[in-house]
Amino acid sequence: MDIEFEATFIDIDLDIFRKKLKSVGAELINPERLMKRVVFDPPQDMAGAWLRVRDEGDKITMSIKQVTGNKIDEQKETELIIDNFEEGVKFLESIGGKKKSYQENKRESWLYREAKIEIDTWPGLESFVEVEAKSEKMVKSISEDLGLDFSKGLFGSVEIVYKIKLGIPPKVINDETPEITFENPPLQYK
């Protein structure tokens, strides 16, 4: 798997951030759209790993992701483009993937200096920003260009944002929440 150099930034004023994107010449490549995914545990034990089929609105992907820590170089991913969401789900089931959850989010995608800038909205959460580039150095530089403080970046999956914002333990969001949708969003954890 390749390292996925990505940082997540929360507590962002999106009006100001979109103006900044436009002022630096970023290109809106996809307006906000609904994305859906089915997430699986791999058939063999891989710490911090999951399989996913995701309908991104303009393409369908199947991937394996693994997060082994909370540093930018501890996120790995291999992703394929496929042509059928349901067949992708069947494929992962047929190789022994254990279905964990169905999840939705909304995403707006920008391109800046060969980096992907995503504005994500997940059920129950305020929108946040992800910056993904080819290296840690590039993520830092682009974050700086966009007025984002790299030292406040989060590294990992959305489970971290659910923990910070709603107090939901990662194990609960990852292993005990079979559906994350806008009709049935996670609530503050008690």
Task: Identify the residue ranges that each predicted region occupies.
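A hydrophobic, small-residue-rich beta->alpha segment in the mid-to-C-terminal subdomain
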Residues: 136, 140-149
